[in-house]
């Protein structure tokens, strides 16, 4: 079937592939912890008692430990809030309901593997290295199980195939999650965190790599923590901010109402996407960004 014909199929009888959300589905809900489970206070209390040094590699620098503790303090405060989501529930309208942790407490690592700069480094997502993550994931699966058992979902024939209704204890559910979970749902972040050096940061507030002159990092790796949602819009915002600030260095900072960047002092043809730059005169001294 030609791609352009797909919308017409939906017009005829309200069915067809265009009526089914694609690639992972649409979000059903972004749930705060207290909407996931009534045991949220016990989960938070248990998490606050865990020694962070036991969760990191034995050779982790003290700055990494300090940064991790600072992040856990922030995250556990958010776990208490009725307005901060910790789980995303997505449904493709077909045969799969996905549950994603959007404020995980676990932390991974990235290490040099060899002296060959071409070889890839060693990544370890550290999935479920913080035991609270598994507690939250278990509670979230049980919440989704209750939802799929509701009358409206049963009316459309919802049934559970994995892990299966026979898997009922928290211990068994947690085991099934460990076996079936993936470490990242196409949203890896935070390998070059924008933090102070005292907290284990890699780049500063201008995204300059500490200790390396002339090198910046501009992507999702600079997020100190995973954003509580999808990453694309935040990546766009970071790139837009950096591109604008970099343009100021060379005097290219004119900004027109039609949302096109133009070199300062240039003439802009409103009827075209082309810029006429015969009179390129920077209106300020190049900065130090």
Residue ranges, per PLM feature:
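Contiguous hydrophobic segments
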Residues: 7-32, 97-99, 106, 111-117, ...
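Short acidic alpha-helical/loop segments enriched in Asp/Glu that coordinate divalent cations
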Residues: 151-165
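Surface-exposed beta-strand-to-loop junctions
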Residues: 8, 116-122, 155-158, 170-173, ...
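Alpha-helix boundary/capping detector
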Residues: 163, 170-171, 233
């Amino acid at each position: 079937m030609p791609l352009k014909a797909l919308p017409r199929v939906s017009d005829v009888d309200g069915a067809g592939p265009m009526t089914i959300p694609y690639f992972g589905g649409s979000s059903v809900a972004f749930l705060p912890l207290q909407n996931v489970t009534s045991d949220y206070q016990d989960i938070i209390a248990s998490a606050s008692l865990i020694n962070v040094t036991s969760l990191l590699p034995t050779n982790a620098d003290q700055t990494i430990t300090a940064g991790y503790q600072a992040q856990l303090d922030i995250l556990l405060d958010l776990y208490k809030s009725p307005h901060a989501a910790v789980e995303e529930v997505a449904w493709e309208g077909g045969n799969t309901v996905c549950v994603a942790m959007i404020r995980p407490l676990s932390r991974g690592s990235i290490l040099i593997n060899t002296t060959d700069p071409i070889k890839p480094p060693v990544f370890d997502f550290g999935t479920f290295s913080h035991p609270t993550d598994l507690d939250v994931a278990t509670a979230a699966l049980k919440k989704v199980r209750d939802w799929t058992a509701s009358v409206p979902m049963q009316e459309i024939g919802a049934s559970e195939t994995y892990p299966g209704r026979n898997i009922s204890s928290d211990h068994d559910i947690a085991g099934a999650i460990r076996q079936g979970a993936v470490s990242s749902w196409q949203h890896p972040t935070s390998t070059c965190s924008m933090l102070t050096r005292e907290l284990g940061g890699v780049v500063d507030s201008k995204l300059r790599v500490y200790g390396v002159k002339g090198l910046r990092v501009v992507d999702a790796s600079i997020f100190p923590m995973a954003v509580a949602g999808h990453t694309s819009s935040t990546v766009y915002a970071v790139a837009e901010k950096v591109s604008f600030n970099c343009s100021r260095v060379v005097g290219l900072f004119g900004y027109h109402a039609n949302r096109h960047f133009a070199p300062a002092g240039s003439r802009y043809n409103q009827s075209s996407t082309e810029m006429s730059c015969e009179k390129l005169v920077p209106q300020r001294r190049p900065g130090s960004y």
